Amino acid sequence: GGESGVKTIHYLIDKALENPALQGRTFISHAFALGYMPKKDLAHTAERLAEAKVGICSSVPFRNMLMPFRELKKTGVEVFVGNDNVQDHWGTFGSGNMLQKANLAAELYGYETEFELSRCLRYATNGKIPLDDQGNSVWPKVGDDANLLFVDASCSAEAVSRISTVNGLIHQGNVVKWNNSSQA
């Protein structure tokens, strides 16, 4: 965070702008300095992040600070949410369940409509959502990696809002979990 965090963020943006091969392949972990920036500075930084195609991978929430996900997404910055692991030493709350993180993000950021909740699914799925903003099917498609969760929900919004039970997990085409039995 703080001044050194801001300088680091701008340094990484500059490096991505200087080297186009880094664009779309560079992510800043945590990036908590963004959560403390004045709005004007945040707007400028978000525009630069989007221009350089530098994404953010952070947590929800971190102590008493909310990351400016909405502002970043509006400018086109790719935003991911993660856990360090199930026993997260930086934040002891939660189970490691990414649907729980997506639910928490929706609650904290005021995403309440079916559409807004459906967009929050991307925080649990490494950016994948089944429908784009216009309702067109975008995932899964033939040729996509076979990494899937099967949840007890009628739609994406319900999966996020109810933290639906995971009934099955397929990773790289292999069944890892089906109902309550582990296949690994």
Model-derived regions: residue spans:
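Active-site core of metal-dependent hydrolases
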Residues: 1-67, 87
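Active-site-proximal flexible loops/turns
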Residues: 5-7, 37, 91, 154, ...
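Alpha-helix N-cap/helix-start motif
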Residues: 5-6, 65, 91-95, 159
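His/Asp/Glu-enriched, well-ordered alpha-helical/loop segment
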Residues: 15-26, 70-153
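Fold-independent oxyanion-binding glycine-rich loops
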Residues: 30-31, 59-60, 83, 153-154, ...
